[in-house]
Amino acid sequence: MRGSGTPRQFSTQLAVIGSGIAGFAASIFAVNRQIATAQVGNTGALAYTTGYLDLIGKRGGAVVVDPWQALASLRESEPKHPLSRLDAGDIRQAFTEFTDFLGACGLAYSAPGTDNLTALTPAGTLKQTLCVPATMAAGPRALAADAPCVIVDFKGLKGFSGAELAANLRQRWPQLTTQRIVFPGMERGEIYPEVMARALEVAATREQLAAALRAVAGTAKLIGLPAILGMHRPDQVRAELERLTGREIFEIPTMPPSVPGIRLRELMQQVLPQKGVTLIPQQRVTALSFEGDGATLALCDAFGPIRVHAQAVILATGRFLSGGLEAHPAGIREHLLDLPVTQPADRADWYRARYTDPRGHPINSAGIEIDDSFRPLTGEGRRYHERLFAAGVILAHQDWIRGRSGTGIAIATAFKAVTEAERFLAGRQTMVPGASPLQCH
């Protein structure tokens, strides 16, 4: 029976709770610092991401070209915003370290630059982002140059329309055209991006698709596709299709769940254990307690109960979609430790009268409070525990949707939380050279 029996006991230096971008980023930064790490979390929201890595895309409804300048402005107007509490150099290092890690593992990204890139959305609108996957990088370049390009969509694919993209971008991109083809081997019924991406792992499918693309490309120098260029080797799939078609190819995100998000999730689940992280995916921590010598996480899997003993913990459980925060008739609560949540005083004040109110909705800034070391605070303003740190959009005083800053908050605050946890662990002298990354009792 699930949950019965003697718990399996594990010990580690750092436990990361959460499997979204903040949780995986924390594990990456911990691995790079040789901190023995265990990560636990249910599915998280990674599959809902576009693959773009935003820092700050909008401020007050206006498009942000220079996110670093916007960061300085944010510090002036919103000093409690999580990004305002971080040094710009640390944020840049966090993005660089994160993208370098992904690139070394086979998922290349553009490096963080001075200005945002203008990237495409599935609806043919534009957004500002700091880094994009290499498979998407040609899109912003082609848009800026008004290069001759054809967007190709597929019969039976819902949620991605080349005609819609071309219509919405006509004034900005006059040389953009569109074509619809049949995906090889999927001539009937609905088709799905994840299935298409996995099919393109097969050489024969790539050759058939390339032939179909050549037939409709015409004089276009570039071909834009929905994000389907393989699941585990997207850069190689793109390179081969470019060779076979003789044209530069780029991806455009689809509606979620999206292939770029699934790629990230599957890459992390494959690579992090190879780097020494003990990954316990698809499981939710049911209890977290602190003792004098550490913290204990309680959870269960199909084989029974598990206890993970850690010297430090990073809480990166997200907001509502990921289950870090829960909405109840009496208010919003943090589900694991019942940490106090900064929120509107009354449920009636969660939302403004107009859905499109440019000020946003107060509920979207709800979250937990932290001190300057990113340790969660009690209602009295004291640290909940010296071993507990927090990262990601569970933090209060930020509306990541309006600011187009969700990934930036996740990556940058994970970097800070790991930095502070490393400092704490070093002070406790828990780093033992030559020790096994994780010990099982």
What are these regions (language model features)?
Residues 10-12, 303-312, 384:
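Core beta-strand elements of the Rossmann-like FAD/NAD(P) dinucleotide-binding domain
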Residues 12-39:
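N-terminal Rossmann-like FAD-binding beta1-loop-alpha1 element of flavoenzymes
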Residues 15-17, 285, 308-318:
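Short hydrophobic core segments
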Residues 28, 323-332, 385-386, 393-429:
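A conserved FAD-binding loop/helix module that cradles the flavin
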Residues 41-76, 186-199:
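Conserved N-terminal glycine-rich FAD pyrophosphate-binding loop of Rossmann-like flavoproteins
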Residues 43, 303, 310-312, 316-323, ...:
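Glycine-/small-residue-rich beta->alpha transition segments that form the dinucleotide
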Residues 160-170, 203-218, 223, 229-287, ...:
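Helical element adjacent to the flavin cofactor pocket in flavoenzyme catalytic cores
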Residues 303-305, 341-347, 353-400:
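FAD-binding beta-loop-beta segment adjacent to the flavin cofactor pocket
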